Swiss-Prot record:
<keyword id="KW-0873">Pyrrolidone carboxylic acid</keyword>
<dbReference type="Pfam" id="PF00714">
    <property type="entry name" value="IFN-gamma"/>
</dbReference>
<feature type="glycosylation site" description="N-linked (GlcNAc...) asparagine">
    <location>
        <position position="39"/>
    </location>
</feature>
<keyword id="KW-0964">Secreted</keyword>
<feature type="signal peptide">
    <location>
        <begin position="1"/>
        <end position="23"/>
    </location>
</feature>
<keyword id="KW-0732">Signal</keyword>
<keyword id="KW-0202">Cytokine</keyword>
<feature type="glycosylation site" description="N-linked (GlcNAc...) asparagine">
    <location>
        <position position="106"/>
    </location>
</feature>
<comment type="similarity">
    <text>Belongs to the type II (or gamma) interferon family.</text>
</comment>
<keyword id="KW-0341">Growth regulation</keyword>
<comment type="subunit">
    <text>Homodimer. Interacts with IFNGR1 (via extracellular domain); this interaction promotes IFNGR1 dimerization.</text>
</comment>
<dbReference type="GO" id="GO:0010508">
    <property type="term" value="P:positive regulation of autophagy"/>
</dbReference>
<dbReference type="GO" id="GO:0006959">
    <property type="term" value="P:humoral immune response"/>
</dbReference>
<feature type="modified residue" description="Pyrrolidone carboxylic acid">
    <location>
        <position position="24"/>
    </location>
</feature>
<dbReference type="InterPro" id="IPR002069">
    <property type="entry name" value="Interferon_gamma"/>
</dbReference>
<feature type="glycosylation site" description="N-linked (GlcNAc...) asparagine">
    <location>
        <position position="107"/>
    </location>
</feature>
<keyword id="KW-0325">Glycoprotein</keyword>
Length: 166
């Protein structure tokens, strides 16, 4: 490696690190702006305990935690939607919403679109209710753990294989 390559690599590292730090600093600034707007640092906010943090502590497995996180993300999206016309905090909400969705959906726009589509489904619509009930069996089957079924099939076929070889 020559001197120019090393200098270029070093400069890129400095640029990427500082931009990441800048993004993180902006993220925290926007949260502080929202805390100030909602007066969320006031001592009475602690009354009744945390809203989400205790629940998150109870769910340890990554797949289980995603379920709870999806409900929490849904809550924040609804909260941000309620204040979408508020120009004072609009930029802060947009920044945090964008970062939250990137973190939760790992930059997958199709997952994000599906998630947003789901939370916007009107529950009081009769046609939606009918479709939901019609799809209920398939949804329930999809909720069933498939790993146990595969294990049973595999052990069953192994058992047959041993029996046949005798």
């Amino acid at each position: 490696m020559n001197y120019t390559t090393i200098c270029l690599a070093f400069q890129l590292c400095v640029i990427f690190c500082s931009s990441g730090y800048y993004c993180q600093a902006m993220f925290f600034k926007e949260i502080e702006d929202l805390k100030e707007y909602f007066n969320a640092s006031n001592p009475d906010v602690a009354d009744g305990g945390p809203l989400f943090l205790d629940i998150l502590k109870n769910w340890r497995e990554e797949s289980d935690k995603k379920i709870i996180q999806s409900q929490i993300v849904s809550f924040y999206l609804k909260l941000f939607e309620n204040f979408k016309d508020n120009q004072i905090i609009q930029r802060s909400m947009d920044t945090i919403k964008e970062d939250m969705l990137v973190r939760f959906f790992n930059n997958s726009s199709s997952k994000l679109e599906d998630f947003l589509k789901l939370i916007r489904i009107p529950v009081n619509d009769l046609q939606v209710q009918r479709k939901a009930i019609n799809e209920l069996i398939k949804v329930m089957n999809d909720l069933s753990p498939r790993s146990n079924l595969r294990k049973r099939k595999r052990s069953h076929s192994l058992f047959r294989g041993r029996r046949a070889s005798k």
